[in-house]
Amino acid sequence: MTTFSPASCWPNPFDLSFVHGEVRTDGRTLERLTVRAVVPRGDELLLVHSRVNGDLMFPGGGIEAGESHHVALARELLEECGAELREVGGLLGETREYRAAREPGFDAYCIRSLYYLCRIGDQLVAPQPQPYEIRLGFMPGWFALDEALQTNKTQLAGPCPQWTARETRVLAQLQRWHQQGIFDHG
């Protein structure tokens, strides 16, 4: 069973970077900080499935002004999954996605995502999705790690959102940890 501890960081957190297209990452970068929830239950993970794109992603999103990471995780879990956040464990790792900036004066736009181990309440209520989440057909569900990873790998073979590569690499890291006995979510 994955354990929750007050430790602020997982023993060996992952650190992954992605560059989408021609991007100058050593110039002025505008950063957007996001949080993502890794919620294990038995042999499964709580993920959000896009019925439009077919991919799976971890619940999460941007941190609003004045929000702590904990508050942002709670808001995103309720919006996307109808889940009540009960506990935040350690930081499992982070990703950085760079793409060309659209804003004047910046060379790159970076989405920095922090992945936290989370525990939720037993009951899910109706999600409260944002309009874009409704357009993408977001639907929460419990998925086996191997199944989720294979689903996203299949999606990567065709046109898919840029975030699919990020989520696939994180799922692959969790699978490696699981195989090494580090992330035993069962």
Which residues does each predicted region cover?
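Conserved Nudix-box catalytic region and its N-terminal flanking loop in Nudix hydrolases
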Residues: 40, 44-83
